[in-house]
């Protein structure tokens, strides 16, 4: 910017420089060394604003305090700026005809690439920049439209070189022929080239089909918003309809649709797979029905497998001629594939009968469960005591529902039945039949039920004593008539006159001695006692039984103060029951036997307790003996250690 280098400036040039921003001040206020003497504009607002003034580039910005940037226009293109045509005279037209003066600061011609930093407002080189300081794309609409549509992206349009300067009349008059004649010629030539090169653009045609998305593009419409890669592709998009691409498939279309041979093979494969799946489902359904009926056999599947094998064999591809010469293993393998309904989906290592394996597993599970049930039942037999056999079981009068339940009917909760009504009907219908049931227990239970139903309040002391006396009489009668029971643990003789008292745990020697005495005296005492009691069993039991029944009925009537509830079989046992005397005697005998069994069980439990006490005592003695031995050993060890320490 030296005055010696530049020619003398006139008033117009001075005014233009005062409106042009100082490039050094735009970079930094301290960069410009001239300060207030600088002939260019120093605007802080323009320095902070990166946008360029559009009016400045058009040559008509009249605001001296414009907040937009006014970059220099003459040094960017290598020629001085000329004013507008309306502001200059005719002799001044010859000024642009002068030869362009290169920038003396740079000394080299500028390149045809616009400066990126200048467009962002950050170029600090100014006139020394080797790139063109061009405005942004919005600065000149007409050349910008021409560049995007028709000109290649890499070659700038000649009109762009003068876009930073003021446009003159000659440029404006010559621009329309240059802009609008080229599209007509290119479109005309493009249609001819389009017909010649239509079949050579298969890849681009498939791309257009995906880009259209179902919409047609008219032939006369030009895409101004996207620069096309080449002239031929742009014309193909604008001038050819969708139908031509469909009617003329390209070699690359096989990538999307596939060949005809592939489609045929795929359809045959799908049909064959569907046929196999359908037949396989029918075959599996048939096997499941047979398996659910618990009659699964391979012979039932013979006909179905044969039909399925023939149908699948007919649907398969023809086998080669060398199939007949194959060995036995290959034939078996093929036969297994034909028989397996899932041969089309499962590999050879899975060619097995799934239903057969399932049935075998089910059968093995059933056998294991049955064996486990047998073991558990044998273990629980000694722990769980089943209900005693009742009169209904002995007479075969078990209800039909319990008989239907089988052997587990006794383990299930018993059903509530009217024992009194059934007992009364049985006594009336079969008075002479040998009833060896539990008549006495049933009568006592009936009386207890009657007492529970007719309970009116607490009983007096006399009633309780009478009931206790009746119970003692019944026990004495049962002890006289009951036989001597023998168990596996201990044999005892029950006698009401000499009862066995439990004095406490006894040693093992005393228990064994008592057992030997019982075994030796059993043979002699059993026969004599049986003969003594056999004569008076029937008469005594009859009398005791009748007395007990009368006492029970009397106590019920006295305790309630009203007519007591009497079951149908609690009628007066007088002459009406004279035919059933034998039945009553046998019932009393059975009741005494049950009492004996209960006493035997209690005696066995006492014996178990005694044995446990004896075993515990022996173990304690043995433990004490071991403890003494351990103490002696410890003393010996201690003495030995002390001796070692002393020495």
Swiss-Prot record:
Keyword Metal-binding among record annotations: yes
Disulfide bonds: none
Entry keyword set: DNA-binding, Metal-binding, Repeat, Zinc, Zinc-finger
Any one GO molecular function term: zinc ion binding
Keyword presence, Zinc-finger: yes
Compositionally biased region (Polar residues): 160-175, 189-203, 369-379, 435-445
UniProt biased composition (Basic and acidic residues): 267-280, 347-359, 419-433, 527-536
Pfam family, one: zf-CCCH_2
SMART domains named among the record's database cross-references: ZnF_C3H1 (SM00356)
Record protein name field: Zinc finger CCCH domain-containing protein 19
C3H1-type ZnF: 16-45, 47-73, 109-136
Positions of the UniProt region annotated as Disordered: 78-106, 155-280, 308-327, 335-452, 512-580, 586-605
Skewed-composition ranges (Low complexity): 86-106
């Amino acid at each position: 910017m030296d005055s010696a280098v530049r020619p003398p400036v006139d008033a117009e040039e001075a005014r233009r420089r005062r409106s042009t921003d100082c490039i050094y001040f735009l970079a930094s206020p301290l960069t410009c060394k001239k300060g207030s003497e600088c002939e260019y504009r120093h605007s802080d607002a323009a320095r902070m604003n990166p946008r360029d003034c559009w009016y400045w580039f058009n040559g008509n910005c009249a605001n001296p305090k414009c907040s937009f940037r006014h970059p220099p226009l003459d040094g960017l293109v290598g020629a001085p700026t000329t004013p507008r045509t309306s502001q200059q005279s005719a002799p001044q037209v010859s000024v642009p005809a002068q030869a362009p003066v290169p920038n003396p600061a740079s000394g080299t011609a500028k390149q045809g690439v616009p400066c990126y930093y200048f467009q962002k407002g950050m170029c600090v080189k100014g006139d020394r920049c080797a790139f063109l300081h061009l405005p942004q794309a919005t600065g000149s609409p007409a050349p910008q439209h021409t560049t995007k549509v028709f000109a290649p992206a890499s070659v700038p349009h000649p009109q762009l070189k003068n876009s930073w300067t003021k446009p003159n009349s000659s440029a404006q008059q010559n621009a329309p022929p240059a802009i609008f004649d080229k599209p007509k010629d290119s479109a005309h030539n493009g249609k001819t080239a389009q017909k010649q090169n239509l079949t050579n653009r298969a890849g681009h045609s498939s791309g257009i089909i995906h880009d259209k998305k179902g919409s047609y593009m008219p032939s006369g419409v030009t895409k101004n918003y996207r620069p096309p890669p080449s002239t031929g592709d742009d014309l193909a998009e604008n001038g050819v309809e969708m139908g031509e691409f469909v009617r003329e498939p390209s070699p690359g279309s096989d990538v999307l649709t596939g060949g005809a041979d592939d489609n045929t093979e795929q359809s045959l494969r799908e049909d064959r797979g569907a046929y196999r799946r359908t037949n396989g489902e029918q075959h599996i359904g048939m096997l499941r029905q047979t398996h659910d009926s618990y009659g699964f056999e391979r012979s039932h599947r013979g006909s179905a497998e044969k039909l399925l094998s023939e149908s699948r064999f007919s649907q398969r591809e023809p086998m080669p001629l060398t199939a007949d010469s194959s060995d036995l293993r290959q034939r078996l393998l093929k036969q297994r594939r034909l028989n397996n309904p899932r041969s089309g989906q499962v590999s050879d290592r899975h060619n097995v009968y799934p239903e057969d394996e399932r049935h075998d597993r089910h059968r093995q599970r059933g056998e294991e469960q049955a064996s486990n049930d047998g073991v558990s039942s044998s273990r629980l037999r000694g722990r769980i005591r089943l209900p005693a056999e009742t009169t209904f079981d002995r007479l075969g009068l078990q209800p039909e529902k319990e008989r239907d339940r089988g052997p587990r009917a006794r383990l299930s909760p018993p059903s509530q039945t009217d024992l009194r009504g059934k007992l009364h009907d049985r006594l009336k219908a079969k008075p002479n039949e040998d009833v060896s049931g539990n008549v006495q227990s049933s009568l006592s239970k009936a009386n207890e039920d009657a007492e529970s139903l007719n309970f009116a309040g607490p009983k007096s002391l006399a009633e309780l004593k009478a009931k206790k006396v009746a119970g003692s009489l019944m026990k004495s009668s049962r002890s006289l008539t009951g036989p001597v029971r023998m168990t596996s643990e201990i044999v005892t003789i029950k006698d009401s006159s000499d009862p066995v008292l439990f004095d406490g745990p006894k040693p093992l020697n005393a228990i064994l001695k008592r057992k030997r005495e019982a075994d030796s005296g059993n043979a002699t005492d059993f026969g004599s006692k049986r003969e003594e009691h056999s004569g008076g069993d029937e008469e005594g039991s009859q009398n005791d039984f009748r007395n007990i029944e009368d006492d029970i009925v009397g106590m019920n009537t006295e305790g309630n103060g009203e007519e007591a509830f009497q079951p149908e079989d609690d009628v007066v046992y007088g002459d009406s029951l004279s035919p059933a005397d034998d039945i009553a005697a046998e019932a009393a005998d059975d009741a005494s036997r049950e009492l004996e069994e209960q006493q035997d069980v209690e005696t066995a439990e006492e014996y178990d307790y005694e044995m446990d006490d004896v075993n515990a005592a022996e173990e304690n003695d043995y433990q004490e003996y071991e403890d003494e031995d351990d103490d002696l050993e410890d003393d010996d060890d201690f003495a030995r250690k002390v001796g070692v320490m002393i020495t």
